[in-house]
């Protein structure tokens, strides 16, 4: 398997397991609805672990463009491979998101909370305060 395919599959696994557990907790009429943040953090931990174990021996398991750029910046990864890795990671993330969306297809209509639906795929502040939110993300 090529390192690019490994990054694509690893990132896809990460997103399917990570976003999948969030969908299970926040979307209506799922078996895990309202099971809480500890289930989400544990699910993400398992997702990262499984994805890293699945592809680390093939690609180094960057699974994130920021990691790839950081590794290249400190000289531990070739800049020539950065665009291919990032393309594979973005593609894997999109495919993972599509799989999660399809897996929970009936639950999207059953959930009226727009913030909850959005939370399946990204984080958002509970209290909107640009300065504080920016600091929290840095």
Identify the function of each model-found stretch.
Residues 1-138:
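Membrane-interface helix-loop junctions and terminal tails of multi-pass membrane proteins
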């Amino acid at each position: 398997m090529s390192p690019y395919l490994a990054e694509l599959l690893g990132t896809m696994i990460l997103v399917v397991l990570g976003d999948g557990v969030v969908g299970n907790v926040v979307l209506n009429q799922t078996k895990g609805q309202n099971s809480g943040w500890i289930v989400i953090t544990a699910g993400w931990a398992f997702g990262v672990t499984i994805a890293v174990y699945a592809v680390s021996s093939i690609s180094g398991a960057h699974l994130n463009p920021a990691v790839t750029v950081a590794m290249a910046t400190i000289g531990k990864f070739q800049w020539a491979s950065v665009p291919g890795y990032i393309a594979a990671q973005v593609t894997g993330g999109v495919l993972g998101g599509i799989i999660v969306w399809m897996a929970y297809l009936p639950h999207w209509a059953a959930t009226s909370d727009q913030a909850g639906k959005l939370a399946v795929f990204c984080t958002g502040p509970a209290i909107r305060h640009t300065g504080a939110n920016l600091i929290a993300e840095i």
